[in-house]
Amino acid sequence: MSSFIVTRRGLLRTGALSGLALAAPMHFVRGAYAEDKMSCNVPTGDTVTFGFNVPLSGPYADEGQDELKAYKLAVKHLNGEGDGGMLPTFSSKALKGNGILGKKVAFVSGDTQTKADAARDSAKRMVEKDGAVVITGGSSSAEAVAVQSLCQDLGVIFMTGLTHSNDTTGKDKKRYGFRHFFNAYMSGIGLGPVIGEAYGADRKAYHLTADYTWGWTQEESMKAATEKLGWQTVKTVRTPLGIGDYSQYITPVLNSGADVLILNHYGKDMINSLTQAVQFGLRDKQVNGKQFEIVVPLFSELMAQGAGEAIKGIYGTANWDWKLTDPGTKAFTQSFGKEYGTPPSQAAHTCYVQALLYADACERAGTFYAPEVIKALEGFDFDGLGNGPTLYRAEDHQCFKDILVVQGKEAPKDKFDLLEVRKIIPAKDVTYDAKIFGGDLGPADAKTC
């Protein structure tokens, strides 16, 4: 059996990741840096403050708690503590483990409550009262869009957390916002051919969709992908965020003529809707002479743990998985496991990477002055952070990298081994014209606060 055990001597890991050597901490010293240009909260003392804005309550709280763990680990590594994590595997060698530009990294955090208004208020407070020079985090696209707009107004860079709506780097994109996570359009491109091969071209789909920006664009992307296969969309139904009982939404599916249910839900909402759909017996039914199937376009190991047996055989997509074998993934999984006793989620991974990418951009720019940091991020090619070669595209601030098609394992080894990576979709196959989703990045003008 595969397990994570924390001891005084570090992480003892049985299975595929055993025997990995810990990277040595870095203790390079750099002289003090004098800023000659000012933007909001450019640090003048010996520390620089990050603002971690994550959902610690609400339906996406499990993701938020893992994000905060990852951010705290990133701060340790940036400050030269611990084993260095992904710093040694990162293709850029600007970060030396001595803070950023000679300043020690400090942080403040806030609870977004999985609500856009609360996320915006929390971010504003961290900028205006706590002096945060960057805001990062979140697990809802509604939060991301709201905070990104605020940060554009304040002149503070926002490194998004887990946000999957096409709108984040589409119609609602901002010069001060950057997304590492993939999007709904990419999920549709990756997942469509796989479920087409698995379930055939003659299918009728029923969508239950979280009623906010992510759900809307996920539904749109999955409709496009499945209708391209020849599937018929029977009905699309919007559901409120954070409800516990989905019976009133699942019951009509039974008599709709649909033979596939597509759940455009995330976090606890996905856990509840999927488990209840299975309890209603949907997966045991034959409809139109076919076995009824359920598809969850976006899910994670954390959600799989919550869904339990219901996740078996379910197809979806993911941004990253801790069982990948590249050096960056191995290093991060080892560090996170040593610190917390569990493997990291995709939410933890994308947030850890975003913290490193911002810090690295400051080092490469030689300043915290926001317009120069933005320039350092735009068009940046990098590798070694768990997703293979990656581009931070300048036109929309979207990262392009390989994505994963995953499926719930029928016979998992343990509660950490619930997903099987079925296919890796190359970055070139999910790359699209930046103009298709509209939007305008806006100016990079510096602002003081």
Language model segments and positions:
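N-terminal export signals
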Residues: 2-4, 10-32
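C-terminal segment of N-terminal export signals and the immediately downstream linker at the start
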Residues: 26-53
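Beta-alpha junction/loop-to-helix N-cap segments that form part of ligand/metal-binding clefts
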Residues: 35-38, 62-69, 84-170, 180, ...
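Short beta-strand segments enriched in small/hydrophobic residues
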Residues: 47-64, 68, 205-208
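Short, solvent-exposed amphipathic alpha-helices that sit
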Residues: 63-91, 187-190, 213-229, 357
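Extracytoplasmic ligand/sensor domains, especially the bilobed periplasmic-binding protein
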Residues: 117, 129-237, 283-285, 290-315
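Extracellular/periplasmic ligand-binding modules, especially the Venus flytrap/periplasmic-binding
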Residues: 267-270, 322-381
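Solvent-exposed, acidic/polar segments of extracytosolic/periplasmic ligand-binding ectodomains
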Residues: 381-449
